[in-house]
Structures are given as structure tokens and as C-alpha cells.
């Protein structure tokens, strides 16, 4: 039985992003081991997926002592488990995991690039040392979108043969059974509505993600406050502040906390229920590999307004499947919000077109099968002794 290790710094990745994949692989004859830092989700994940889990401590940021301890734990784990395939899903897990597994002799080392490289704003700067080491020690680099693939082939300096795009992109597609209006529980819908407390005819503008500068929260809040529709709308932000990591201005924070037309929630396990209430989803991010929330909104047929960063425009096409505005342009975003309010029938048509595309290309079951087949091919190569 081939052995597969799935590596992430935080266990929440297995619960929210990769759920179902370990179970599917186990059912298809693989021995699966999940590896991450400790967390309260682990027992629930192991029960749901039917797989083992090993704890390796990871710390945020750069800490040479703690990072070396994590590396050594990973190296000894690889030597003990001797997996056929290791697959990492975030930058620190990729950096430490690819290096440790290479030195431990793991033949197939896959890293999923889920975020744009740090040189996106200035390609001449080249990749960071962490990115270079990660890419050098991986045997395959799975990218999230067509736009990301084009960018990396042009600007990374890494041989193009290492980069792979499975299907049309995305880490694991979208669960069309979960993000389905017919499947939502009434009590959760009521609870979501009670937290927002919309007026009878309020236009609900939803944003999901960390409240950081990189996610375009400052522009979104500014555009909303300046818009002509503010008295007839509510802005709902689902995400926590990350002031120590990527701070937004105190002025923006004050608006979020005090404006009667803005609602902020740190987190929720029921994003689908808030999408069901929303009239439009706004994703104003400055950088994106391929946003899962865009797929989730599309599956729920919620109209989308997004920035023109690479990961967004790989899915959303201007005035075909949504509205696209230049990164950081408050005035254009304001106009898009007002257009979405007035031309709801037009936005609905965009959402219908996008829904058909997502069902065809990004159904989680289809994406899972593509990944499973890729792993199977690696296992066959392993049996034949091929690289």
C-alpha cells in the first residue's frame, strides 16, 4: 500500500480546505498521514477522515531555533514513515517539509503554491530565499490558477517542467453539496440573519477573509462609506483583524467598529449561510493565488465584484461573470457597488454564467479525482523505479 503524507502548518487547513481528500485516498488504497501543529480540530478531523495524525510544532514568522526544531522533527518523521509521496500546502510547511523530505530521501515531493510569490509587485526582485529553497527541493509544484502558472513560468527562474496545473486550477475545487442553497439549515440561516440584523430591503454586501491591507479592506470600507447606496445597504465583513501581521489604518478600524451600517464577525463555520443572505460578494484583494471564497460564492450563485489581481481574473471576467476593478481604486469600486445595487438583474445573469462554469470545471469531486489520478501515476513510477 503506497503511503502519503499531507503537510500543513495548521490543522484547520485539513478541516476547511482539504476535507474529504484524505478519506478518499484512504478508501482508494493509500495509507494517509496528516502532519501539522497541534490544534483542537485534530480529533474531529481524524474521526471524519479515518486517518492518522502526527503533531509537528510550527511557529508563525521566522524563528531560527523553533524552525530548526520543526525541520528536525519533520526529517526524523520522514525517515521513520518513509512515504512514497509528501504534499505540503502552505509556505512554511513547504519550505521545511520539502527540505526535510528531500534530505530524508522521499522520492515524490509536491508543494501546492496557493499564494502568489512575494515578488508579484516587482518581478525584477526575484523569489525570496524561502521560495527558492522550497521550489528547488520539490519535485513538482502544483499551481492554483492559469494566471499564476503564466506568471511563474515568466518570472520565477524555475524550470517550467516543475509547474503543473491540474484541470482548470484551484486547490481542491468547491463542495457543490455544501454550498447549495437547498442544503442549508434553517436554524443557521436564522442565526446568520440575527447577527447581521438587515433592514427589510437592505442590500447586503459581503466580504470574507482576513481584515488586512493586502485583502483590500481599506478600499472596500472607503468605497462603501462614500457610496450613494450606504443608507440602503449593509457591509458584512467576516474575518479577524491581523494588526501585528498586515495592519489596516486606525481610521478604517474605527469605521468598522462604529459605523451602524457595517457588521464585522471574527469567524464562522457557516459561510454558506451568509452567502445565502448576501446580494453581492466583494473580494478586493491585492494578491491572490486562487480564492476559494470566489468559488463558494459562485456555487451559491451570488454575484461577484473583485479586484483585477491574477488569481481573481483567472475566474472572473469583466461584465461576463462579474465586475472587475483595478487594485486599490476606491472610486471604481464605489461605482461597481452602485452599479450592482441598481442593475441587480445584470449581476444575476453574470452569476448564472459563472455558476455553470464552476459546476463544469471546479466541482470538488472532479478535482479530487484529478489529484488522485496524479498520485496514482506517481505510485506507478515509484514501482518502476522512475523519477
Predicted regions and their residues:
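A short, histidine- and acid-enriched strand-loop-helix "catalytic/donor-clamping" loop
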Residues: 9-14, 59-62, 103-125, 138-140, ...
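A conserved mid-protein helix/loop that constitutes part of the nucleotide-sugar donor-binding site
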Residues: 14-20, 203-226, 323, 331
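Short, structured helix-loop element that forms part of the nucleotide-activated donor/catalytic region
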Residues: 43-47, 234-261, 265
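Donor nucleotide-sugar binding/catalytic pocket of nucleotide-sugar-dependent glycosyltransferases
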Residues: 54, 136-188
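Short His-centered aromatic/hydrophobic patch
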Residues: 88-94, 113
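Aromatic "clamp/platform" in nucleotide-sugar-dependent glycosyltransferases that forms part
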Residues: 267, 286
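Short hydrophobic beta-strand element within catalytic cores of glycosyltransferases
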Residues: 303-306
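Conserved acidic donor-binding segment of nucleotide-sugar-dependent glycosyltransferases
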Residues: 318-319, 323-330, 339-345
Amino acid at each position: 500500500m503506497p503511503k502519503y503524507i499531507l503537510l500543513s502548518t495548521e490543522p484547520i487547513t485539513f478541516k476547511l480546505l482539504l476535507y474529504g481528500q484524505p478519506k478518499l485516498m484512504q478508501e482508494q488504497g493509500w495509507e494517509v498521514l496528516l502532519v501539522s501543529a497541534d490544534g483542537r480540530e485534530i480529533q474531529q478531523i481524524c474521526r471524519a477522515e479515518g486517518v492518522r495524525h502526527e503533531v509537528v510544532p510550527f511557529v508563525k514568522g521566522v524563528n531560527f531555533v523553533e524552525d530548526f526544531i520543526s525541520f528536525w522533527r519533520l526529517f526524523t518523521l520522514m525517515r521513520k514513515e518513509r512515504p512514497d509521496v509528501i504534499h505540503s500546502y502552505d509556505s512554511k510547511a513547504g519550505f521545511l517539509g520539502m527540505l526535510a523530505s528531500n534530505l530524508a530521501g522521499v522520492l515524490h515531493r509536491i508543494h501546492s503554491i496557493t499564494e502568489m510569490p512575494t515578488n508579484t509587485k516587482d518581478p525584477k526582485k526575484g523569489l525570496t530565499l524561502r521560495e527558492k529553497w522550497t521550489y528547488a527541493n520539490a519535485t513538482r509544484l502544483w499551481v492554483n490558477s492559469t494566471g499564476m502558472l503564466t506568471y511563474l513560468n515568466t518570472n520565477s527562474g524555475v524550470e517550467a517542467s516543475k509547474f503543473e496545473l491540474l484541470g482548470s486550477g484551484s486547490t481542491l475545487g468547491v463542495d457543490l453539496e455544501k454550498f447549495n442553497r437547498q442544503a442549508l439549515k434553517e436554524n443557521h440561516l436564522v442565526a446568520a440573519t440575527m447577527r447581521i440584523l438587515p433592514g427589510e430591503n437592505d442590500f447586503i454586501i459581503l466580504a470574507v477573509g482576513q481584515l488586512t491591507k493586502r485583502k483590500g479592506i481599506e478600499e472596500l470600507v472607503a468605497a462603501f462609506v462614500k457610496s450613494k447606496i450606504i443608507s440602503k445597504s449593509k457591509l458584512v465583513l467576516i474575518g479577524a483583524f491581523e494588526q501585528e501581521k498586515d495592519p489596516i489604518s486606525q481610521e478604517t478600524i474605527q469605521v468598522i467598529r462604529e459605523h451602524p451600517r457595517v457588521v464585522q464577525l471574527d469567524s464562522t463555520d457557516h459561510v454558506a449561510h451568509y452567502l445565502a443572505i448576501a446580494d453581492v460578494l466583494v473580494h478586493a484583494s491585492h494578491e491572490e493565488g486562487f480564492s476559494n471564497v470566489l468559488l463558494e460564492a459562485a456555487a451559491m450563485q451570488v454575484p461577484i465584484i473583485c479586484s483585477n489581481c491574477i488569481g481573481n481574473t483567472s475566474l472572473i471576467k469583466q461584465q461576463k461573470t462579474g465586475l472587475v476593478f483595478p487594485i486599490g481604486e476606491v472610486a471604481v469600486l464605489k461605482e461597481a457597488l452602485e452599479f450592482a445595487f441598481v442593475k441587480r438583474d445584470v449581476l444575476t445573469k453574470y452569476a448564472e454564467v459563472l455558476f455553470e462554469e464552476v459546476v463544469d470545471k471546479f466541482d470538488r469531486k472532479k478535482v479530487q479525482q484529478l489529484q488522485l489520478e496524479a498520485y496514482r501515476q506517481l505510485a506507478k513510477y515509484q514501482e518502476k523505479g522512475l523519477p
